[in-house]
Amino acid sequence: MWSRRFAVAGAVLLGAVLVAPPGAAAAPTVPSPAALAAAAPAGLIPDRPSPEDVRRALVRVERASHGKVRLGVVGRTNEQRPIRLATVGTGSTRLLYMTQQHGDEPLGTPAAVRALWALGVPDSAWHRWLRSRVTIDIVVQANPDGAVRNQRYNHDPSASGDYSEPGVGYDINRFHNPITPIEDNPVPESRAILRYWHATHPAIVVDYHMQGRYLQPDGRETTASILWPTSPLAGPAAVDRSRQLAVRNYDAMTYVAGANVTRYPGGDYEGIARNAYGILGSASLLVELSDLPQEQTAFQIRTAFVSMIATAQGAADGSLWRVNGDRADSIPARGPSLPDTPALRRADAA
Protein backbone atom coordinates (compact mmCIF):
# COMPACT_ATOMS: atom_id res chain seq x y z
CA MET A 1 0.00 0.00 0.00
CA TRP A 2 1.21 3.51 -0.78
CA SER A 3 1.84 5.58 2.34
CA ARG A 4 0.40 9.10 2.41
CA ARG A 5 3.93 10.56 2.46
CA PHE A 6 4.94 8.77 -0.72
CA ALA A 7 1.61 9.45 -2.39
CA VAL A 8 2.05 13.19 -1.79
CA ALA A 9 5.72 13.16 -2.80
CA GLY A 10 4.88 11.16 -5.89
CA ALA A 11 2.12 13.50 -6.95
CA VAL A 12 4.47 16.46 -6.59
CA LEU A 13 7.35 14.80 -8.42
CA LEU A 14 5.36 13.20 -11.22
CA GLY A 15 3.15 16.25 -11.62
CA ALA A 16 6.13 18.57 -11.84
CA VAL A 17 7.64 16.76 -14.80
CA LEU A 18 4.46 17.23 -16.76
CA VAL A 19 4.68 21.01 -16.67
CA ALA A 20 4.97 22.07 -20.29
CA PRO A 21 7.88 24.27 -21.37
CA PRO A 22 7.14 27.93 -22.17
CA GLY A 23 5.02 28.30 -25.28
CA ALA A 24 3.82 24.69 -25.27
CA ALA A 25 0.32 23.49 -24.53
CA ALA A 26 -0.07 22.37 -20.95
CA ALA A 27 -0.10 18.63 -20.42
CA PRO A 28 -3.14 17.08 -18.74
CA THR A 29 -2.94 16.48 -15.01
CA VAL A 30 -1.05 13.31 -14.18
CA PRO A 31 -2.85 10.65 -12.12
CA SER A 32 -1.36 9.96 -8.72
CA PRO A 33 1.18 7.13 -8.48
CA ALA A 34 -1.28 5.24 -6.29
CA ALA A 35 -4.02 5.54 -8.91
CA LEU A 36 -1.70 4.37 -11.67
CA ALA A 37 -0.54 1.40 -9.60
CA ALA A 38 -4.11 0.48 -8.71
CA ALA A 39 -5.27 0.47 -12.33
CA ALA A 40 -4.19 -3.13 -12.93
CA PRO A 41 -6.50 -5.74 -11.38
CA ALA A 42 -5.32 -7.93 -8.54
CA GLY A 43 -4.12 -11.29 -9.78
CA LEU A 44 -3.21 -10.00 -13.24
CA ILE A 45 0.14 -11.82 -13.11
CA PRO A 46 2.03 -13.78 -10.43
CA ASP A 47 5.10 -12.26 -8.81
CA ARG A 48 7.31 -14.95 -10.35
CA PRO A 49 5.52 -15.79 -13.57
CA SER A 50 6.01 -18.69 -15.94
CA PRO A 51 6.05 -18.04 -19.70
CA GLU A 52 2.44 -19.23 -19.83
CA ASP A 53 1.51 -16.79 -17.04
CA VAL A 54 3.10 -14.01 -19.10
CA ARG A 55 1.21 -15.02 -22.24
CA ARG A 56 -2.15 -15.09 -20.46
CA ALA A 57 -1.54 -11.76 -18.72
CA LEU A 58 -0.48 -10.00 -21.92
CA VAL A 59 -3.52 -11.30 -23.79
CA ARG A 60 -5.71 -9.99 -20.97
CA VAL A 61 -4.04 -6.57 -21.17
CA GLU A 62 -4.41 -6.44 -24.95
CA ARG A 63 -8.11 -7.26 -24.81
CA ALA A 64 -8.82 -4.79 -22.02
CA SER A 65 -6.98 -2.05 -23.93
CA HIS A 66 -9.08 -2.52 -27.10
CA GLY A 67 -5.96 -2.51 -29.23
CA LYS A 68 -4.02 0.24 -27.47
CA VAL A 69 -1.55 -2.40 -26.26
CA ARG A 70 -0.20 -4.39 -29.18
CA LEU A 71 1.46 -7.79 -28.87
CA GLY A 72 4.18 -9.34 -30.97
CA VAL A 73 7.22 -11.59 -30.95
CA VAL A 74 10.81 -10.47 -31.58
CA GLY A 75 12.26 -13.96 -31.90
CA ARG A 76 12.27 -17.49 -30.53
CA THR A 77 14.47 -19.33 -28.08
CA ASN A 78 16.36 -22.55 -28.66
CA GLU A 79 13.28 -24.37 -27.35
CA GLN A 80 11.08 -22.32 -29.72
CA ARG A 81 9.42 -20.31 -26.98
CA PRO A 82 8.38 -16.85 -28.21
CA ILE A 83 10.36 -13.86 -26.96
CA ARG A 84 7.36 -11.64 -26.32
CA LEU A 85 7.03 -7.96 -27.18
CA ALA A 86 4.30 -5.61 -25.98
CA THR A 87 3.92 -2.07 -27.27
CA VAL A 88 1.86 0.88 -26.04
CA GLY A 89 1.72 4.34 -27.58
CA THR A 90 2.19 5.78 -31.04
CA GLY A 91 4.50 8.72 -30.36
CA SER A 92 7.69 9.58 -32.18
CA THR A 93 9.94 9.09 -29.14
CA ARG A 94 10.64 5.39 -28.69
CA LEU A 95 11.53 3.64 -25.45
CA LEU A 96 12.65 0.03 -25.04
CA TYR A 97 12.36 -1.79 -21.71
CA MET A 98 13.48 -5.37 -21.23
CA THR A 99 12.92 -7.70 -18.28
CA GLN A 100 14.25 -11.02 -17.03
CA GLN A 101 17.27 -11.51 -19.28
CA HIS A 102 18.36 -13.73 -16.40
CA GLY A 103 15.64 -16.31 -15.88
CA ASP A 104 15.99 -16.33 -12.10
CA GLU A 105 15.49 -12.54 -11.80
CA PRO A 106 11.73 -12.22 -12.33
CA LEU A 107 10.36 -9.13 -10.60
CA GLY A 108 10.72 -6.71 -13.51
CA THR A 109 8.30 -8.86 -15.51
CA PRO A 110 5.16 -8.38 -13.37
CA ALA A 111 6.08 -4.69 -13.08
CA ALA A 112 6.13 -4.42 -16.87
CA VAL A 113 2.78 -6.15 -17.30
CA ARG A 114 1.20 -3.85 -14.71
CA ALA A 115 2.76 -0.80 -16.38
CA LEU A 116 1.28 -1.89 -19.71
CA TRP A 117 -2.16 -2.06 -18.11
CA ALA A 118 -1.70 1.27 -16.30
CA LEU A 119 -0.65 3.06 -19.49
CA GLY A 120 -2.69 1.20 -22.08
CA VAL A 121 -6.11 0.44 -20.61
CA PRO A 122 -7.38 3.70 -19.03
CA ASP A 123 -8.39 6.42 -21.47
CA SER A 124 -8.15 9.70 -19.58
CA ALA A 125 -6.86 12.87 -21.24
CA TRP A 126 -3.47 12.25 -19.66
CA HIS A 127 -3.29 8.69 -20.95
CA ARG A 128 -4.17 9.80 -24.48
CA TRP A 129 -1.59 12.59 -24.26
CA LEU A 130 1.17 10.25 -23.08
CA ARG A 131 0.42 7.62 -25.72
CA SER A 132 0.49 10.27 -28.45
CA ARG A 133 4.01 11.34 -27.50
CA VAL A 134 5.89 8.09 -26.83
CA THR A 135 5.99 4.53 -28.09
CA ILE A 136 7.02 2.10 -25.35
CA ASP A 137 8.23 -1.33 -26.45
CA ILE A 138 8.75 -3.93 -23.74
CA VAL A 139 10.51 -7.25 -24.23
CA VAL A 140 8.63 -9.06 -21.47
CA GLN A 141 10.60 -11.96 -19.96
CA ALA A 142 13.47 -11.99 -22.44
CA ASN A 143 14.68 -15.42 -21.25
CA PRO A 144 11.65 -17.73 -21.05
CA ASP A 145 13.77 -20.90 -21.30
CA GLY A 146 15.75 -19.74 -18.28
CA ALA A 147 12.57 -18.73 -16.48
CA VAL A 148 11.08 -22.23 -16.63
CA ARG A 149 14.31 -23.58 -15.10
CA ASN A 150 14.78 -20.69 -12.63
CA GLN A 151 18.32 -20.25 -13.95
CA ARG A 152 20.42 -17.28 -14.96
CA TYR A 153 21.40 -18.66 -18.37
CA ASN A 154 19.40 -19.36 -21.49
CA HIS A 155 18.98 -23.00 -22.54
CA ASP A 156 21.72 -24.25 -24.84
CA PRO A 157 23.33 -27.63 -24.06
CA SER A 158 26.02 -26.83 -26.66
CA ALA A 159 27.12 -23.67 -24.83
CA SER A 160 30.83 -23.24 -24.23
CA GLY A 161 33.40 -20.50 -23.88
CA ASP A 162 33.25 -17.13 -22.20
CA TYR A 163 30.03 -16.06 -20.46
CA SER A 164 28.53 -19.54 -20.55
CA GLU A 165 27.80 -22.40 -18.21
CA PRO A 166 28.99 -25.33 -20.35
CA GLY A 167 26.18 -27.72 -21.12
CA VAL A 168 23.61 -25.32 -19.64
CA GLY A 169 23.49 -22.09 -21.62
CA TYR A 170 24.79 -18.59 -22.22
CA ASP A 171 24.46 -15.43 -20.15
CA ILE A 172 22.21 -13.42 -22.46
CA ASN A 173 23.41 -10.15 -20.96
CA ARG A 174 26.93 -10.66 -22.27
CA PHE A 175 25.97 -11.02 -25.92
CA HIS A 176 24.64 -7.59 -26.96
CA ASN A 177 28.03 -6.59 -28.35
CA PRO A 178 27.29 -4.07 -31.12
CA ILE A 179 30.68 -4.72 -32.71
CA THR A 180 30.02 -8.43 -33.32
CA PRO A 181 27.96 -9.14 -36.47
CA ILE A 182 24.50 -10.19 -35.34
CA GLU A 183 24.59 -13.32 -37.48
CA ASP A 184 27.70 -14.47 -35.56
CA ASN A 185 25.99 -14.08 -32.17
CA PRO A 186 25.28 -17.56 -30.69
CA VAL A 187 22.45 -16.38 -28.41
CA PRO A 188 18.98 -16.13 -30.01
CA GLU A 189 17.56 -13.91 -27.28
CA SER A 190 20.34 -11.34 -27.65
CA ARG A 191 20.14 -11.49 -31.45
CA ALA A 192 16.41 -10.76 -31.31
CA ILE A 193 16.81 -7.72 -29.06
CA LEU A 194 19.70 -6.34 -31.11
CA ARG A 195 17.72 -6.71 -34.32
CA TYR A 196 14.74 -4.97 -32.75
CA TRP A 197 16.95 -2.11 -31.60
CA HIS A 198 18.25 -1.66 -35.14
CA ALA A 199 14.68 -1.72 -36.49
CA THR A 200 13.41 0.96 -34.09
CA HIS A 201 16.40 3.01 -32.81
CA PRO A 202 14.91 3.76 -29.37
CA ALA A 203 16.00 6.95 -27.64
CA ILE A 204 15.95 5.15 -24.27
CA VAL A 205 16.74 1.58 -23.20
CA VAL A 206 16.14 0.36 -19.62
CA ASP A 207 17.11 -3.17 -18.57
CA TYR A 208 15.55 -4.65 -15.38
CA HIS A 209 17.46 -7.21 -13.28
CA MET A 210 17.78 -8.48 -9.70
CA GLN A 211 20.75 -8.59 -7.36
CA GLY A 212 21.66 -9.90 -3.91
CA ARG A 213 21.40 -7.95 -0.65
CA TYR A 214 23.77 -5.13 0.31
CA LEU A 215 24.31 -2.59 3.08
CA GLN A 216 24.86 1.09 2.38
CA PRO A 217 27.59 2.90 4.33
CA ASP A 218 24.96 4.50 6.58
CA GLY A 219 23.64 1.06 7.59
CA ARG A 220 20.48 1.06 5.48
CA GLU A 221 19.89 -1.88 3.18
CA THR A 222 20.07 -1.19 -0.54
CA THR A 223 16.77 -2.06 -2.18
CA ALA A 224 17.74 -1.15 -5.76
CA SER A 225 20.85 -0.15 -7.70
CA ILE A 226 21.24 1.63 -11.03
CA LEU A 227 24.05 2.35 -13.49
CA TRP A 228 24.55 4.04 -16.86
CA PRO A 229 27.02 3.00 -19.62
CA THR A 230 30.64 2.89 -18.47
CA SER A 231 32.25 1.52 -21.63
CA PRO A 232 34.82 3.89 -23.18
CA LEU A 233 33.20 3.08 -26.52
CA ALA A 234 29.98 4.89 -25.55
CA GLY A 235 29.91 8.43 -26.92
CA PRO A 236 29.79 11.43 -24.55
CA ALA A 237 26.32 12.51 -25.68
CA ALA A 238 24.81 9.08 -25.00
CA VAL A 239 26.55 8.86 -21.62
CA ASP A 240 25.32 12.33 -20.66
CA ARG A 241 21.73 11.42 -21.54
CA SER A 242 22.09 8.11 -19.70
CA ARG A 243 23.22 9.95 -16.57
CA GLN A 244 20.16 12.19 -16.83
CA LEU A 245 18.06 9.03 -17.10
CA ALA A 246 19.80 7.65 -14.01
CA VAL A 247 19.06 10.78 -11.96
CA ARG A 248 15.45 10.76 -13.11
CA ASN A 249 15.09 7.15 -11.98
CA TYR A 250 16.95 7.75 -8.74
CA ASP A 251 14.54 10.54 -7.81
CA ALA A 252 11.41 8.61 -8.76
CA MET A 253 12.47 5.36 -7.13
CA THR A 254 13.62 7.16 -3.97
CA TYR A 255 10.91 9.76 -3.44
CA VAL A 256 7.92 8.08 -5.07
CA ALA A 257 8.53 4.37 -4.43
CA GLY A 258 10.49 4.83 -1.19
CA ALA A 259 13.45 2.74 -2.35
CA ASN A 260 17.02 2.96 -1.04
CA VAL A 261 18.83 3.39 -4.35
CA THR A 262 22.57 3.02 -4.87
CA ARG A 263 25.08 2.95 -7.72
CA TYR A 264 25.69 -0.50 -9.19
CA PRO A 265 29.39 -1.46 -9.48
CA GLY A 266 29.22 -2.61 -13.10
CA GLY A 267 32.00 -3.24 -15.60
CA ASP A 268 32.72 -1.76 -19.00
CA TYR A 269 32.37 -4.85 -21.24
CA GLU A 270 30.55 -3.84 -24.41
CA GLY A 271 28.42 -7.02 -24.54
CA ILE A 272 26.41 -5.94 -21.47
CA ALA A 273 23.12 -4.38 -22.58
CA ARG A 274 23.67 -1.26 -20.46
CA ASN A 275 26.90 -0.58 -22.34
CA ALA A 276 25.92 -1.94 -25.75
CA TYR A 277 22.90 0.28 -26.27
CA GLY A 278 24.82 3.28 -24.98
CA ILE A 279 27.49 2.55 -27.58
CA LEU A 280 24.74 2.44 -30.20
CA GLY A 281 23.56 5.88 -29.05
CA SER A 282 20.60 5.31 -26.74
CA ALA A 283 20.26 6.70 -23.24
CA SER A 284 20.77 3.39 -21.42
CA LEU A 285 20.19 2.34 -17.83
CA LEU A 286 20.48 -0.79 -15.72
CA VAL A 287 17.97 -1.19 -12.86
CA GLU A 288 18.73 -3.90 -10.28
CA LEU A 289 16.10 -4.84 -7.69
CA SER A 290 17.52 -6.43 -4.55
CA ASP A 291 16.36 -9.96 -3.75
CA LEU A 292 14.57 -9.04 -0.53
CA PRO A 293 12.42 -11.34 1.64
CA GLN A 294 9.06 -12.43 0.25
CA GLU A 295 7.09 -9.89 2.29
CA GLN A 296 8.85 -7.09 0.37
CA THR A 297 8.20 -8.49 -3.11
CA ALA A 298 5.26 -6.16 -3.79
CA PHE A 299 7.42 -3.20 -2.78
CA GLN A 300 10.13 -4.24 -5.23
CA ILE A 301 7.67 -4.70 -8.08
CA ARG A 302 6.25 -1.26 -7.31
CA THR A 303 9.77 0.21 -7.45
CA ALA A 304 10.27 -1.11 -10.98
CA PHE A 305 6.77 0.04 -11.95
CA VAL A 306 7.55 3.58 -10.75
CA SER A 307 10.79 3.53 -12.75
CA MET A 308 8.90 2.58 -15.92
CA ILE A 309 6.21 5.23 -15.47
CA ALA A 310 8.63 8.00 -14.50
CA THR A 311 10.87 7.30 -17.49
CA ALA A 312 7.88 7.38 -19.84
CA GLN A 313 6.60 10.65 -18.41
CA GLY A 314 10.00 12.32 -18.56
CA ALA A 315 10.41 11.26 -22.18
CA ALA A 316 6.88 12.34 -23.09
CA ASP A 317 7.22 15.95 -21.96
CA GLY A 318 10.99 16.32 -22.41
CA SER A 319 11.67 17.05 -18.75
CA LEU A 320 14.03 14.08 -18.65
CA TRP A 321 16.50 16.02 -20.79
CA ARG A 322 16.44 19.01 -18.42
CA VAL A 323 17.67 16.93 -15.46
CA ASN A 324 21.13 17.74 -14.09
CA GLY A 325 23.02 14.59 -15.00
CA ASP A 326 26.00 15.60 -12.85
CA ARG A 327 23.92 14.53 -9.85
CA ALA A 328 24.57 10.93 -10.90
CA ASP A 329 27.98 11.24 -9.24
CA SER A 330 26.30 11.69 -5.85
CA ILE A 331 24.33 8.43 -6.00
CA PRO A 332 25.85 6.40 -3.14
CA ALA A 333 27.87 3.24 -3.71
CA ARG A 334 26.02 -0.04 -3.22
CA GLY A 335 28.09 -1.23 -0.28
CA PRO A 336 29.13 -4.70 0.90
CA SER A 337 27.03 -7.85 0.85
CA LEU A 338 24.61 -8.28 3.71
CA PRO A 339 25.99 -11.03 5.96
CA ASP A 340 24.15 -14.21 6.88
CA THR A 341 21.91 -14.37 3.81
CA PRO A 342 23.33 -17.45 2.04
CA ALA A 343 20.05 -18.33 0.34
CA LEU A 344 19.97 -14.96 -1.38
CA ARG A 345 23.56 -14.78 -2.57
CA ARG A 346 23.78 -14.85 -6.33
CA ALA A 347 26.20 -14.37 -9.18
CA ASP A 348 24.52 -11.07 -9.92
CA ALA A 349 27.00 -9.19 -12.07
CA ALA A 350 24.65 -7.66 -14.62
Show which residues each predicted segment covers.
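Secretory targeting and sorting signals
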Residues: 1-28
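C-terminal accessory segments enriched in acidic
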Residues: 7, 29-50, 185, 189-192, ...
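Short glycine- and acidic-rich boundary segments immediately preceding or forming the N-terminal edge
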Residues: 28-79
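Active-site-proximal beta-strand/loop segments in catalytic clefts of secreted hydrolases
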Residues: 74-76, 88, 98-101, 139-144, ...
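Alpha-helical scaffolding within the catalytic cores
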Residues: 80, 153-158, 267-274
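Short beta-strand-to-loop junctions in surface cap/lid or active-site-entrance loops
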Residues: 84-92
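Short glycine/proline-enriched loop/turn "hinge" motifs that connect secondary-structure elements
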Residues: 88-89, 161-165, 276-282
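Active-site/substrate-binding loop(s) of hydrolase catalytic cores
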Residues: 92-96, 106-239
